[in-house]
Amino acid sequence: MKLNELYNNIGAKKNKKRVARGIGSGKGKTAGRGVKGQKSRAGVAIKGFEGGQTPMIKRLPKRGFNCISSKKYNVINIYNIEAAIAEERLNANDVITKEKLIEIGLINKSNKKLVKLLSICSDDFNYPLSFKLDSYSSKAKEIVEKAGGKLL
């Protein structure tokens, strides 16, 4: 037996059914789509259409609303700032602003979103940094001021 003499067992590999290749193929003419109508045409069916019955999306009640006055925040944790200082992407003497955080890639550029400083997993923060951000959590304020930093 040689590599060029190897072959699959009979019936192990089925050929794909080729549609619209003559009446004798069994899938010719209408290619298994039936006769006329929306589903026989290109583009198939309308998504979400359930054959005339009230669709599920209409049967469920409406919930909630979008508050126009709500503020959307980019959140940044103190431990992210600590890591950036350790990696020397951020200078400990600089005032930390939204522009600076965008520049080093800690937050995404978005003019509409405000920046909020949080304090998750950062009880041992010891850099006397100055921050000029839009908002601070009460714990973050406490940690920064305890380390000798300023909130501008």
From Swiss-Prot:
| Annotated keywords | Ribonucleoprotein, Ribosomal protein, RNA-binding, rRNA-binding
- One CC-aspect GO term: large ribosomal subunit
Could you provide one GO biological process annotation from this protein's UniProt record?
A: translation
Q: Which InterPro entries match?
A: Ribosomal_uL15, Ribosomal_uL15/eL18, Ribosomal_uL15/eL18_sf, Ribosomal_uL15_bac-type
Stated family:
Belongs to the universal ribosomal protein uL15 family.
| Subunit structure, as described in the record | Part of the 50S ribosomal subunit.
Protein known as = Large ribosomal subunit protein uL15
**Species:** Rickettsia bellii (strain OSU 85-389)
